[in-house]
Amino acid sequence: MAAIRMGKLTTMPAGLIYASVSVHAAKQEESKKQLVKPEQLPIYTAPPLQSKYVEEQPGHLQMGFASIRTATGCYIGWCKGVYVFVKNGIMDTVQFGKDAYVYLKNPPRDFLPKMGVITVSGLAGLVSARKGSKFKKITYPLGLATLGATVCYPVQSVIIAKVTAKKVYATSQQIFGAVKSLWTKSSKEESLPKPKEKTKLGSSSEIEVPAKTTHVLKHSVPLPTELSSEAKTKSESTSGATQFMPDPKLMDHGQSHPEDIDMYSTRS
């Protein structure tokens, strides 16, 4: 029993010491955590060091819609063009019918005689080309009908003729320009040599140039006697100037002796 009491007495102080040590360590950790200042707190989250932008890849549904759109785009554009053309044609014909109805409802006095002249001229063309070819059967009635229309309506016929002449001239100029451009392109292509021939010519010229220079150097022309004598005198004078040596006795060394030339600076 005495031993048990001694054990209890020894274990209780050890437990108290351990508890005090753990509490002290926790307090130290809390104090360390509270030492951070508000200015040092991060406002934003730090971005990753190795970031890379990756585009979103389209899915199967998007690829299918894109292929359908590209396949049907040209057909849709063609259908739109046809629809606009037909719509404009229908609107023009309806407007022409309305104008014709208004005009025929209250026609002028000379309308019926003029129409009679035009129809009679067309029938005359049919009768004259009755036994002819198909070309005559088409051209004769149209030609005589247009002739009657020009006689009956001269002002309108002149305006129509001017407009058609301008259109024909513009189209002819466009055709002429296109043909001329094609002709000039073909002529330029024919006139220009091939690049291989150019390289051959360049190499041959490069090889022949030194031969020509050597050939020119070989054929020397004799100079006249006067020029040769002048050249000789010039060469002699230059050689004499280079070979001239001054007399050391005549040289002025100042106050120094000629023997001490290495020790003092001389005057020239």
UniProtKB/Swiss-Prot annotation:
Its main location: mitochondrion. Residues 187-200, 249-260 have a biased composition (Basic and acidic residues). It comes from the Eukaryota. Residues 28-110, 156-268 are mitochondrial intermembrane. Residues 130-137 are mitochondrial matrix. GO terms for biological process: cristae formation; inner mitochondrial membrane organization. Keywords: Membrane, Mitochondrion, Mitochondrion inner membrane, Phosphoprotein, Transit peptide, Transmembrane, Transmembrane helix. The keyword DNA damage does not apply. Pfam families: ApoO. It is found in: Mitochondrion inner membrane; Mitochondrion. Residues 1-27 form a transit peptide. This is MICOS complex subunit MIC27. It comes from Homo sapiens.
